[in-house]
């Protein structure tokens, strides 16, 4: 049973999570190994990309560069290099005619050439002869290779198989001076015809080429015989082929070197071939409009020379699509599928594969022109069925007629009917990328639709599909687009959507359904499908308002960021723009609300935009393929109007980060996104770094005395957000899919206006002045702070999401240039926790300060005065060179005031310090002076999170508790202006130390006045930790002022039973009647599965009188969740045993609780490793490492005495 609510988002409490998502330490001689990337699962799992080629004649033959007038200086895209000049190679054999680049002359600044000697300008040839499918092929595959040998590669433009000036107008360039830089003529006019000429371009200087559409006369152009002088009245033709990747003339930017000395043009499919598995869907080439659906042309697979399955490593790919030594493309990489279709057709099918189909579709000489009708919604439905594993629709793939007719319908490629399962891993992301024109035809024969006008009989397999009703889904989308209910339903069943051929927008209904509802209930978690689409804009028709474009609707509703708690069936309100329109762009530069370009929608209005769109789509696709979230923070602890939740995300495909703000519904608690992190232009961003005692702008000229002194201006600008130098060729910088780096362990921190009532009863120095300070700051801009692995602390306006400033700590600089490298492997930079507080400065008065750590990113600690977020000030920026005891601080720094009046930062030093031991670090917040309190000299150790305690409940800290990685819990006492340390307890199991990673939690038992400390043991810092199955434990200790000698003075609590209640894995614990002298312990051993390495690496928390603990059970057998599963447990804090009444409501919210074999449930299982839960009212939300959230009801009042408890609000019981 699936209990997940939304994805991707990881939820956790405000308490620090140690080791939940782990990363690199950046330490040269690290004693404690810390992984360089997150360990919580899905690492290196390849994504699935299905390419939907809605290729019929407009997609193939439409003009790519739409401008009818050639403009010198404007770059036009196609197979030719705009920065090269070409000559034409004539041969009596047509197949041997082509253009080839020349080393000299070189193009002029406006892409023109000195055309004497038979030279042509490559930029002009792109404008003149490029069809829409050409840049699509170029971007995806490198282009259609008509000749592909070790020594030579020649590309050929798409076939233009019919007369159609509407799709490719006949053009003219006028003016001898202009033409002299483009073509080798002395003409005043250069008239061009492409339509109806196959792979050729015809030209003349006279209008007969235009006025006579039946003109078939054209002499093959030969520069040695045709000087094209001023009086030439001839009509000539050239074959539009071009030699590429010729080292003698300079390599194009997409040429890749191979071991045998060849260079081959490659595209995005090859570039991402190690990270994505591909499949392709297309149509049968049948000209009847009564032919339904699409067919699978190439099944989901790796296309490169090796497969890259994480559990197998690199292995030779038996279905590779190119030679690893030469780069030459194979004609038939999937011979089994070709042979199967051969048997059905009765004629040899000799071509197969993803790249081949994309390149050769419409190019094969089967004796039939390209397809006329395009039922695109049914094509999408074919892919929809593939991912849902519903099986092929036989009527879609049937081949009929004679052998030749079957061959033509197959278009000389496989028509695959024995579908496999494209989803190999439950955590794979699945993506569709489509291309087509909006003038679609007869595509309504889908589940739920009863309008059969101009449709054949609906296939029985389609009738049997009850998983979707496209009419209801479409009506729902129209409601979300603002229609009234009746109008929406009327539109959903209308005979046509936006064209006269009885088309529909059901592609959007399918895309929405697949994007928001689990496609595969048989697999763990939710399997969803994200849609990207390229509109080729047939005949320049953008379909404005854009909501009349079915591809825009499909990309919007199949690609929006699904909010937390989203109900895909009941939602009818408009989507928040923050979920689908973050690019700020408009279709066709039409600055109107009805022309906003959805993030996953791209237009091929010209070839330049086509290529840019596809590159952007792939960068987003790769980012989505490994998407996950970090955690949630809030601007309020109460559910009321104005409450906002902030979610940090990372996308490991390109290591991009994001921050999203959600409005919280005050009645239901539902989240509605209203902004994403957004940035000023890179030149205008406020980015600072510490130079001695002041802040300076993060620019090349200011960094000469830092670890970035060797960086180039391009690298520094890249770090600032300049993306103009990104690319995959030498000299370029790493391609990103966004400006901000991934956010993994840094919890977003909201800092709003001060609370003037905070210190009304306090009597320490400055307390009486706080109310005035709060009043002065009442209207300051609220800010959300978060650290990212781009080397920066980011500060965002909490109302708008716009970045106010960023800060680069010194400790992040030494390895920051790696972030710009094309071969970048994940690094951690500013990955630590943040804290903020108002402190009193006897000289300047009250100030708001922020303290941050680098966590896994390095050994650094910094403090900023953020009283005025628009004018921050540096307090200090420290590294381990300043504080010798500082290691990788993996916990939240705490700000506290001690009895001497000093405001201090308290934190555990973390592992990998210079001395390699555990120390408490106490820093004067105003001066940066650090005191180090070592607790032992034992190496391979570090102090974890600290729990400050005010024994007098006056806000003055006089005691601190913290554990270390060798299992000792320490008590630090501040007296006589000094810190004294003593061990309280050492956690062991059968004599072996149990590491303490999480911050302990304290409480006073009201009935006895005894001080209790609660914590669990275990760690998860490296893959070795994940393999470790040693027993860890949960402890509740009484601090009686002396060291607890061992377990003999503690009572034992056991996990006594496990089972399933209403689909939930549950467990119960024992109910001890006698409490040990010094507390209790519970070994995390399953009564059914035994020792599994279950551990507790996140802090405990209170919910009323219940103690909440979260455990994790690692599982290296599942690549999707290496951190495994776990339990959220609720027990009596002062006995360690089960509660006297139910805590988890497992009976469908009925309030009757849950019991296992008559005993109240003590723990609920989560299929992916859980984080600390978050409570909203009586709803408990459990965020897990796989990005899912499980929601359960808990008691709202009564015996559990529900109150919010923190270290300042101490729990006391009667």
UniProtKB/Swiss-Prot annotation:
It holds the Pfam family T4P_PilY1. Ca(2+) binds at residues 952, 954, 956, 958. InterPro entries: PilY1_beta_prop_dom, Quinoprotein_ADH-like_sf. GO terms for cellular component: pilus. Residues 307-334, 438-460 are annotated as: Disordered. Keywords: Calcium, Fimbrium, Fimbrium biogenesis, Metal-binding, Signal. The keyword Calcium applies. Induction: Expression is not affected by calcium. Disruption phenotype: Shows twitching motility, but the speed of the twitching movement is three times slower than wild-type on a glass surface against the flow direction of media. Mutant cells also move more sporadically with frequent stop intervals. Forms T4P. Not impaired in attachment to surfaces or biofilm formation. GO terms for molecular function: metal ion binding. Residues 311-322 have a biased composition (Basic and acidic residues). Residues 443-460 have a biased composition (Polar residues). Residues 1-30 form the signal peptide. It is found in: Fimbrium. One of the three PilY1 homologs of X.fastidiosa, which are involved in bacterial twitching motility as component of the filamentous type IV pili (T4P). Belongs to the PilY1 family. This is Type IV pilus biogenesis factor PilY1 homolog PD_0023. It comes from Xylella fastidiosa (strain Temecula1 / ATCC 700964). The gene is pilY1_3.
């Amino acid at each position: 049973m699936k209990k997940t609510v939304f994805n991707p988002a990881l939820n956790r409490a405000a308490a620090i999570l140690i080791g939940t998502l782990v990363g690199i330490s950046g330490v040269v001689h690290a004693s404690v190994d810390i992984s360089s990337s997150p360990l919580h699962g899905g690492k290196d799992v390849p994504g699935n990309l299905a390419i939907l080629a809605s290729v019929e004649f407009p997609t193939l033959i439409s003009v790519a560069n739409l401008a009818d007038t050639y403009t010198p200086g404007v770059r036009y895209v196609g197979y030719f290099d705009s920065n090269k000049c070409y000559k034409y190679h004539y041969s009596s054999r047509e197949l041997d005619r082509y253009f080839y680049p020349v080393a000299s002359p070189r193009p002029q600044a406006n892409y023109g050439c000195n055309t004497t000697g038979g030279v042509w300008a490559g930029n002009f040839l792109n404008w003149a002869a490029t069809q829409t499918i050409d840049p699509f092929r170029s971007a995806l595959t490198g282009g259609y290779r008509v000749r592909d040998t070790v020594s030579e590669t020649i590309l050929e433009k798409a076939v233009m198989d019919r007369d159609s000036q509407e799709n490719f107008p006949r053009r003219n360039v006028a003016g001898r001076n202009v033409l002299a830089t483009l073509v080798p003529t002395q003409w005043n006019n250069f008239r061009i015809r492409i339509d109806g000429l196959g792979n050729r371009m015809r030209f003349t200087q006279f209008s007969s080429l235009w006025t006579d559409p039946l003109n078939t006369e054209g002499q093959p152009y030969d520069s040695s015989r045709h000087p094209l002088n001023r009086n030439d009245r001839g009509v000539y033709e050239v074959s539009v082929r071009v030699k590429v990747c010729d080292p003698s003339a300079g390599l194009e930017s997409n040429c890749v070197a191979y071991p045998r000395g060849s260079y081959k043009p490659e595209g995005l499919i090859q570039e991402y071939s190690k990270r994505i598995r591909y499949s392709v869907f297309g149509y049968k080439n049948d000209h009847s409009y009564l032919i339904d659906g699409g067919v699978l042309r190439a099944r989901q697979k790796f296309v490169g020379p090796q497969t890259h399955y994480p559990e197998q490593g690199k292995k030779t790919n038996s279905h590779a699509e190119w030679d690893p030594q030469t780069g030459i493309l194979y004609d038939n990489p999937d011979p089994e599928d070709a042979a199967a279709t051969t048997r059905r057709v009765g004629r040899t099918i000799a071509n197969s594969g993803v790249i081949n189909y994309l390149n050769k579709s419409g190019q094969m000489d089967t004796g039939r022109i390209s397809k006329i009708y395009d039922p695109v919604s049914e094509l999408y439905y074919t892919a929809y069925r593939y991912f849902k594993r519903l099986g092929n629709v036989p009527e879609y793939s049937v081949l009929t007629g004679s052998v030749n007719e079957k061959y033509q319908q197959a278009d000389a490629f496989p028509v695959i009917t024995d579908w496999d399962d494209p989803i190999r891993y439950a955590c794979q992301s699945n993506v569709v990328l489509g291309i087509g024109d909006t003038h679609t035809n007869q595509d309504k024969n889908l589940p739920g639709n009863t309008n059969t006008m101009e449709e054949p009989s609906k296939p029985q397999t389609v009738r049997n599909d009850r998983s979707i009703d496209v009419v209801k889904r479409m009506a729902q989308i129209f409601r979300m687009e603002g229609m009234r209910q009746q109008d929406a339903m009327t539109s959903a069943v209308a005979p046509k959507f936006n064209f006269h051929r009885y088309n529909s927008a059901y592609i959007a209904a399918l895309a929405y359904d697949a994007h928001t509802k689990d496609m595969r209930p048989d697999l763990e978690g939710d399997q969803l499908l994200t849609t990207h689409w390229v509109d080729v804009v047939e005949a320049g028709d953008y379909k404005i308002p854009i909501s009349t474009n079915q591809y825009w609707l499909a990309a919007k509703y199949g690609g929006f960021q699904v909010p937390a708690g989203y109900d895909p069936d009941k939602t009818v309100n408009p989507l928040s723009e923050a979920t689908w329109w973050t690019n700020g762009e408009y279709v066709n530069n039409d600055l109107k609300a009805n022309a906003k370009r959805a993030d996953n929608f791209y237009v091929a209005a010209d070839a330049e935009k086509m290529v840019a769109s596809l590159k952007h789509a792939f960068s987003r696709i790769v980012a989505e393929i490994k998407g996950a979230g970090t955690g949630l923070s809030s601007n309020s602890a109460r559910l009321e109007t104005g409450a906002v939740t902030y979610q940090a995300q990372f996308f490991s495909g390109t290591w991009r980060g994001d921050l999203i703000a959600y409005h919280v519904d005050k009645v239901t608690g539902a989240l509605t996104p209203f902004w994403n992190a957004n940035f000023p232009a890179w030149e205008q961003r406020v980015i600072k770094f510490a130079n001695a005692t002041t802040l300076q702008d993060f620019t090349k000229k200011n960094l000469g005395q830092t670890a970035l002194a060797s960086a180039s201006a391009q690298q520094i600008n890249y770090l600032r957000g300049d993306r103009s130098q990104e690319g995959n060729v030498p000299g370029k910088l790493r391609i990103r899919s966004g400006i901000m780096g991934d956010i993994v362990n840094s919890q977003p921190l909201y800092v709003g206006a001060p609370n003037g009532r905070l210190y009304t009863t306090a009597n320490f120095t400055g307390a009486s002045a706080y109310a005035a300070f709060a009043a002065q700051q009442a209207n300051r801009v609220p800010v959300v702070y978060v650290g990212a692995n781009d080397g920066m602390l980011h500060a965002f306006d909490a109302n708008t999401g716009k970045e106010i400033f960023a800060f680069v700590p010194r400790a992040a600089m030494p390895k920051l240039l790696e972030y710009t490298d094309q071969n970048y492997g994940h690094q951690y930079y500013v990955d630590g926790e943040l804290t903020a507080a108002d402190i009193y400065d006897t000289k300047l008065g009250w100030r708001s300060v922020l303290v941050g750590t680098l966590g896994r990113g390095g050994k650094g600690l910094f403090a900023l005065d953020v009283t005025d977020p628009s004018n921050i000030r540096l307090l200090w920026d420290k590294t381990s060179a300043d504080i010798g005891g500082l290691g990788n601080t993996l916990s939240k720094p705490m700000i506290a005031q001690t009895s001497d009046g000093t405001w201090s930062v308290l934190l555990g030093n973390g592992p990998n310090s210079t001395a390699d031991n555990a120390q408490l670090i106490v820093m004067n917040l105003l001066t940066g002076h650090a005191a180090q309190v070592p607790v032992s000299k034992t190496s391979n150790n570090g102090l974890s999170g600290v729990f400050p305690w005010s024994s007098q409940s006056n806000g003055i800290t006089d005691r601190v508790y913290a554990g270390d990685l060798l299992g000792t819990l320490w008590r630090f006492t501040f007296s006589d202006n000094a810190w004294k340390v003593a061990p309280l307890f050492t956690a062991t199991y059968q004599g072996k130390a149990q590491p303490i990673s999480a911050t302990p939690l304290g409480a006073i038992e009201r009935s006895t006045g005894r001080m209790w400390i609660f914590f669990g043991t275990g760690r998860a810092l490296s893959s070795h930790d994940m393999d470790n199955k040693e027993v860890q434990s949960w402890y509740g200790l009484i601090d009686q002022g002396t060291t607890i000698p061992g377990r003999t003075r503690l009572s034992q609590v056991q996990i006594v039973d496990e089972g399933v209640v209403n689909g939930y894995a549950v467990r119960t614990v024992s109910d001890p009647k006698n409490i040990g002298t010094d507390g209790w312990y519970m070994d995390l051993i399953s009564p059914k599965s035994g020792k599994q390495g279950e551990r507790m690496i996140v802090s405990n928390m209170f919910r009323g009188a219940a103690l909440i603990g979260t455990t994790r059970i690692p599982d290296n057998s599942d690549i999707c969740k290496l951190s495994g599963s776990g339990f959220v447990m609720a027990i009596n804090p002062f006995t360690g045993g089960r509660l006297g009444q139910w805590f988890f409501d497992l009976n469908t919210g009925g309030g009757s609780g849950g019991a296992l074999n008559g005993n109240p449930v003590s723990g609920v299982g989560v299929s992916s490793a859980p984080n600390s839960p978050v409570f909203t009212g009586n709803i408990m939300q459990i965020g897990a490492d796989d990005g899912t959230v499980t929601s359960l009801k808990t008691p709202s009042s009564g015996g559990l005495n529900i109150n919010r408890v923190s270290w300042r609000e101490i729990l006391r019981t009667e």
